[in-house]
């Protein structure tokens, strides 16, 4: 079965949405459209554009020490950290830098952090960034893991 991708323009010239109409099922939900963000997760110019838009919500009121990247969003997470540490941003963390981390998962899909990553979570303000939040279960699990390891969700 061939799927047709719809390319939708946005207000940003270097950023577009790619959507596929159909029936898509996960273990917890069913959807009629799939928004493909593969390019945004992989292409630096699009990742930078997304990060710039996202950071505008966090510029003056949120402390971010660590970006927790879910669903392969490390490129965007790195761009978010870059935006948050630019000179025109009032960075509230002590080292003027931001950690970018990804979790590991147990065989039961529980999120865990190895001993070498725990210091980047414990006592830190952690921004959780996910490619998709359909039911909220993954976001909830990530927030619980951050709190379990002694971090605060930003």
Indicate where each model-derived feature is located.
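PRPP-associated nucleotide enzymes
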Residues: 1-154
